[in-house]
Amino acid sequence: MSSCVSSQPTSDRVAPQDELGSGGGSREGQKPCEALRGLSSLSIHLGMESFIVVTECEPGRGVDLNLARDQPPEADGQELPLEASDPESRSPLSGRKMSLQEPSQGGPASSSNSLDMNGRCICPSLSYSPASSPQSSPRMPRRPTVESHHVSITGLQDCVQLNQYTLKDEIGKGSYGVVKLAYNENDNTYYAMKVLSKKKLIRQAGFPRRPPPRGARPAPGGCIQPRGPIEQVYQEIAILKKLDHPNVVKLVEVLDDPNEDHLYMVFELVNQGPVMEVPTLKPLSEDQARFYFQDLIKGIEYLHYQKIIHRDIKPSNLLVGEDGHIKIADFGVSNEFKGSDALLSNTVGTPAFMAPESLSETRKIFSGKALDVWAMGVTLYCFVFGQCPFMDERIMCLHSKIKSQALEFPDQPDIAEDLKDLITRMLDKNPESRIVVPEIKLHPWVTRHGAEPLPSEDENCTLVEVTEEEVENSVKHIPSLATVILVKTMIRKRSFGNPFEGSRREERSLSAPGNLLTKKPTREWEPLSEPKEARQRRQPPGPRAGPCGGGGSALVKGGPCVESWGAPAPGSPPRMPPLQPEEVMEPE
């Protein structure tokens, strides 16, 4: 059985091959891609088939946007897959094994970036959307999340265009795939795009999970867990749409085409990655741990105020922004609740960060807020010691240690007694006596004995609600690529008819049963089932229509049927092309 936690430090890893970013080059002052350039030579490429976890970026890997802009373009006509086709180009798995649900990540750090005291790469300054600004306030009204239900994917010469977004480098890799750097041409801003394959989610839904207890029913005021992976994704979107806090990652846009397999979630770019890797030989100092933990407290207090339980708090889900503050990410297993607390009975999340009451054999109902407090305690322990408090190579032994083993502190590094007291109270195995968030905010270690008080709940939290009308008004309808090509062709041919209609009908007629020996029509638009006399009655008096069936007229210079119609007599009204008969559907 795969191990849950490894006590060995993460080994050096080989950088994965750039799969898409090499096609993102552009000249200075130009956008990465010229939209709809050369539509006649467009090709559509779609190779995404991954469930992306935004927070699973390579820790310490900065996104060098200058390199992303200056990479050489691909050759014309070369396919641009979103995942490397060569298995040897993928990075090997590292020694870190956080859980059965979380594989190791790989990726290089840019050598041109500077390093902070933790060795984490710091990227150059870049433009951000107002939502990602450090000055954003949770008390400001949030702009409704844009939902696009029509997705146009264009394979151009040097990039892959997804609506207004140009997909570039791979900036992270999670349990189900990759995260792509996305450039928005409308606001000249970089974002992180999370891609989900609905088919793959359904295939992977068979991963072994603990069955619900017999006769279990959701408690009043509690949560009802979604039944399938697709429902979990849409629950994550519903939760993220209503959140607006400096310490919570923001969902900017959702691109969803009901007729296609993929769903795209566009997030603000948190460019410095997770706060730390676990396990590590370089834990944080107490001052650094306090700084990040204060951000975590404010973010969790805000989530609980919005009646949301995160259920997967851990260092890899805490991303460091350009301003140095952390943002909570990955709401894939979150729960919304009614009342004062969530009443839960199922087991989800990362095993090493699960609370003992969630691992009980009796499957009793337990508090959702207490689960987040336990995970916060494990995270704080990781901050200062670089490892989890309970570790084992076997999942069942790990569960046993979490439920019964006493908490121990290593001799090194030596930490303050106040910090030991806080961790001990957060990792209380009894959820009823476990410390709660309001008490954590006032703890002497958190506030430096009152020198650094945290804001009150009223200052930190504002209830955010998005009405259905606001969501409907935020939906953006974008024509598909086929529609754009059709309009382009109609304009080029100066025709108001569908230039592809004839070929489609001919193919359908030849494929219909009983029509294999039917004589080919003399005009491309002629339906096989309409008699010749009916066609003649439908035509207006005048010269006989040419072979293109009235696709143009002499009034349009260069039209496809100029030779068939000729010029009208002087002084006579202009002739109109014959009416095109209505399409008759052939049996299939």
Curated annotation (Swiss-Prot):
Stated regulation of activity: Activated by Ca(2+)/calmodulin. Binding of calmodulin may relieve intrasteric autoinhibition. Autophosphorylation does not alter activity or regulation by Ca(2+)/calmodulin. In part, activity is independent on Ca(2+)/calmodulin.
Disruption phenotype annotation: Mice are unable to form spatial long-term memory.
UniProt signal peptide: none
InterPro entries named among the record's database cross-references: Kinase-like_dom_sf (IPR011009), Prot_kinase_dom (IPR000719), Protein_kinase_ATP_BS (IPR017441), Ser/Thr_kinase_AS (IPR008271)
Main location: nucleus
Reactions this protein catalyses: L-seryl-[protein] + ATP = O-phospho-L-seryl-[protein] + ADP + H(+); L-threonyl-[protein] + ATP = O-phospho-L-threonyl-[protein] + ADP + H(+)
Region (Autoinhibitory domain): 472-477
Swiss-Prot/TrEMBL GO biological process terms: CAMKK-AMPK signaling cascade; positive regulation of autophagy of mitochondrion; protein autophosphorylation; protein phosphorylation
Entry note about domains: The autoinhibitory domain overlaps with the calmodulin binding region and may be involved in intrasteric autoinhibition.
Name the UniProt record assigns to this protein: Calcium/calmodulin-dependent protein kinase kinase 2
Native source species: Mus musculus (Mouse)
Gene transcribed to yield this protein: Camkk2
